[in-house]
Amino acid sequence: MNSIDAVVRYSPLRNNLCNLPSAITTMLFSADFNIQQIIVELSWVPHQRAAQRRIAYCGWAGGITKTSSSNPVIEIDRSLASAIDLQENVNVTVNVHIDAVKAITVELEPVTSNDWEIVETHAQVLETYLLNQTRCVYPNQVLVVYPTPQTTARLLVKKIEPEVSTFAQLFNDTEVQIAPKVQKRPSISSVRSDSSGHRIRRVRSSTSTATGRRSVTNNGEVLPSMLRRSITLPNNTYAHVNDSKSGGYKVYCNLNELIPALQNAHFVSVSVLVGPGTPDRTGLTSSKIKQLNDSIDQAAQTQTNAAGSSHPPESSYTETGKVIAELVHDSKSPKGNVGLSELLACSLGIENTVGNLISLEQARKPLIKNPLDTLLTQLMQLLSPLLDSCTFTNCVKLPKIGTLLPNGGLLQFKRIKSGWTTPLGKDNVSLEIGEEILRPESFIPSYDLLPDRKTHVRTQSDQYPTAQENLIESLSKIASGGSLLFGTSGSGKSLVISQVAQIVTNKGHFVKLLNCDKIMSESYNNLRGIFEDIFSEVSWKAPSLLILEDLDSLIPAEQEHSDSSQSRQLSEYFISKLSALSINRDITILASSKSKESLNSLIFTTHLIEHDFQLRAPDKEARKQILQSYLDTLNVFCSEGELLNNIAVETEGYLPKDLKVLCDRAYHDLISRDILADSDSELDIEESSTPILNGSVGDIANKQSEIENGISGLELTNNSSSTIAVDKHGATIQKDNFDSALSGYIPQSLRGVKLQKSDVRWDDIGGLRDAKSILLETLEWPTKYAPIFSSCPLRLRSGILLYGYPGCGKTLLASAVAAQCGLNFISIKGPEILNKYIGASEQSVRELFERAQAAKPCILFFDEFDSIAPKRGHDSTGVTDRVVNQMLTQMDGAEGLDGVYVLAATSRPDLIDSALLRPGRLDKSVICDMPDFDDRLDILQSVTRNMNVSKSVNLSSVAGECSGFSGADLQALAYNAYLKAVHEKLTKDESMAMAGEMDDNDDKKRMVECFQFSGNTEKKSLIELKPSDRATVIKKLEHLYQGNGNHAEGETKSKLATTAANSVIITSKDFEDSLSETKQSISQSEKRKLEAIYQQFISGRDGNMPDGTASNEIGARSTLM
């Protein structure tokens, strides 16, 4: 292909490829060549005097350049151009090669040891993306690789197999070998035994490497320096170092890692490099802050522009004030880190921090103060030539004179108060050296002004997350990939995170904690700016741990009918930035949220979050430890040894925050009772002092002053609860205090959860002895005998099916067992969870079990279970089929039902899907059978317990006449008998009122006549009042007639009379009348049908799965497909 001439332009391609002008690309596209096959040859003359042209080879990136004026343009990366010494705007000749020799083996060698460190760190990245960056190699080529967007490394091509004279093409099977190149570092003993001449020669050679830096003094002296990451003491990483505030200024580091010049130094000059997150108090004046920020930006821009050059420029970072410190060898110091003594860290303004970059520079030679006489003699000798050549006046400025006057000075003549002055010769002139003028104030604080260690050391929090040691240990391990800590509000996430941050900091890692709740209202652009600063800081101080607390408030899950654009934008931004940071630097992410579902799902699509930990509600032993921890903080002791154990049992489902509030309420109750007791004792003293008034006036005055002093002391005590706490040192808390605290308190997990409370007591249910016994074994025993069941290796049953005849007490039994066992109760009806839309019913079931899990220990009761979970395959809409599938998933144990018991009630167990009746789901089936004679008698006694039944009533005979009655029928029988007695009572009261037998307070009889009138002229039939209504009206008139005389006494007598008059007594006749009107709710035919179904359910099930064939029986349901 014909060659063309083009002009070189730099472009940030970040590879060893180039973009070609359209004159070439048009022919390549028309010829249908593969981009990977094209090799571009560039030849140019380096400068006008050069006699030989230079040649380089590269691949084609597939891009097309824009032609400027009439000259074609070729674009190339700046780093690649610097490696092949190709300047911008140079004319080059471009040739395109199609057929090239394929390289089998390529041997490379890093140009410097720093290049080898970069290659070794990012070996996996280079192995993956090397072919995307390079298409060909040629002998003695300086190959530039780009492991990260910010770094480059240069490799020299040493050998190519097969040997070629021009170039060879790389392909997938090419083996690339990179030889290591490690910098040799001499030992400490050999360095410190060298002479000063050897030392200077090594320093000058080391300053040309990238590991060292150079600092030039005003006198032109070159001082070597290095950059290191700092860890301020005290820190567990340097726990073996005995450091104190009086220990002086010291730097602890491994001298083997330093450059030779610093290895031999006993003192170094320490300064802080200003970077992202550097404290503002690091020895800087306020006027320099803007200049430092500008210098950082300029340094970053210069480094970007000069990346990949053959001689990289020196760093232009800005340093703060310098402090001379002693260099101490510490072989246990982490690699790349140095420890700063507490005094040195406070002087630099970075106390109690980790990760700041500091510069270690060889200290200058100290100025030796000469004797005054010698100094004056030398100064006079140097000033003699100036005295001959010029005349000095008062306050003339003197020039800089070596080490005598390094900053120059002012000449001042002494004044003579009186007398005549005569000129003197030079030999008679006397000199004196005064004080320094404009001495700069040191930024190092005075020793006495330095804060104590206790203000800087991160002491362990008083509220340590009890019973979470394993979780904290897992979170504290810095590993690849992020972690998510989720739990409900009040579960202790913030406390665990603060403890993890403290542990990680003590390991020498930088920790950045951000509470996302505080910035959730910011706009997207502002949030990007905030996180750009945070990412820069954690990258600058790496290795780092970035903690994002309450991340779900910033990037919540996308809702169906809400605008989630900002959440999606932030999620994509986090994924791109944090993924790049995690790969390039040692940065780990720890986020917290209320649940995994509350976060945007995009976060979990990548490996940004690889580990998740859930904070569950503490178990009984953990609750006991938490209660003990809070009581120890309050300095309160328990009155009984088993008190905390009993309280832990009663607080099932309480979160750590709830337990803290409970302890505070109990402590407040204790203090309140003490205050009331003290108040009562003071009042008793005051009352006992009343007889003193009969004495003399002096005695009365003295006693009055004593009472006033006692009252004032009482008021001082009541004004401060802390004073009472001191007086009650080691106070003992009682069970009554906890009972008062528990009374009326709703745990945070139960707030907003709809719980049903039933007034039915366990004694109110008659009969059902077997069913009640099985329920107590399942629900009450695991809590009552927890130590025995905890050692049981078997899985406890958590599901019970109550089936039986209608009206036999299934629902009543389920509502009463919750109160009997102290469990929460959630009742569900079918229409509450059934929804025709796909996914809505499943979501309702999931939310239902989540509610039960939050309210555990809890009973989840499904009434009429056959309507919610019928056999699958017979529903044309598929709603109940999906509900059954979801319930199988929730009850199977995969989701976990710890503390949640499922009760289901039905009268048709044959209609329930058989998969729900297998072990592990509804483990036990309990029948609620028709009551026999003993059960009927027990039911009647339970129902009539709160009724006034005449002693003449024989409940046994009534129970004998109720054969075939269910429990609901017997209850209806008793209620009907009570209504009969009420009607008789009302009729009797009406007749007494009409006959005038009810007397007033004066025992005068009155006649009450009831009549109706209407103002309407139209004739209408009057409505006659019922006897009950007439009696009510008469009673109201009676109360109005009584008036106000003797109100209190009359009211008391009226109440007693009313109670006696309103008592309703049920007689045998009432039961006989009720029995004649009450019929059985279950017919004999229905009873026989249900009995056959229950018998088949108990003993006739074969366990076979349905084969999917529709039933041909009459009345069977089928699905139209």
Curated annotation (Swiss-Prot):
Q: Indicate where this protein resides in the cell.
A: Membrane
According to UniProt, the reaction catalysed is:
ATP + H2O = ADP + phosphate + H(+)
What's its top-level EC category? hydrolase
Q: Which GO terms describe its cellular component?
A: cytosol; peroxisomal membrane
Q: Which domain of life is it from?
A: Eukaryota
Low complexity bias located where? 205-217
In Pfam terms, one family for this protein is PEX-1N
> One GO molecular-function annotation for this sequence?
ATP hydrolysis activity
Annotated EC: 3.6.4.-
Q: Name one GO biological process term.
A: protein import into peroxisome matrix
Asked if the Swiss-Prot or TrEMBL record annotates the protein with the keyword Membrane, the reply is yes
UniProt main location, coarse: membrane
Please list every transmembrane segment annotated in the UniProt record, as residue ranges: none
Keywords attached to this Swiss-Prot or TrEMBL record, sorted alphabetically, are:
ATP-binding, Hydrolase, Membrane, Nucleotide-binding, Peroxisome biogenesis, Protein transport, Transport
List, alphabetically, the PROSITE patterns matched.
AAA
Positions of the UniProt region annotated as Disordered:
187-221, 1099-1121
What is its membrane topology? Peripheral membrane protein
What does the subunit section of this Swiss-Prot or TrEMBL entry state? Interacts with PEX6; forming the PEX1-PEX6 AAA ATPase complex, which is composed of a heterohexamer formed by a trimer of PEX1-PEX6 dimers.
Instruction: Describe the task this protein carries out.
Output: Component of the PEX1-PEX6 AAA ATPase complex involved in peroxisome biosynthesis. The complex acts as a protein dislocase complex that mediates the ATP-dependent extraction of the PEX5 receptor from peroxisomal membranes, an essential step for PEX5 recycling. Specifically recognizes PEX5 monoubiquitinated at 'Cys-6', and pulls it out of the peroxisome lumen through the PEX2-PEX10-PEX12 retrotranslocation channel. Extraction by the PEX1-PEX6 AAA ATPase complex is accompanied by unfolding of the TPR repeats and release of bound cargo from PEX5.
Which family does the similarity line name?
A: Belongs to the AAA ATPase family.
What protein does this entry describe? Answer: Peroxisomal ATPase PEX1
Q: Which organism is it from?
A: Komagataella phaffii (strain GS115 / ATCC 20864)
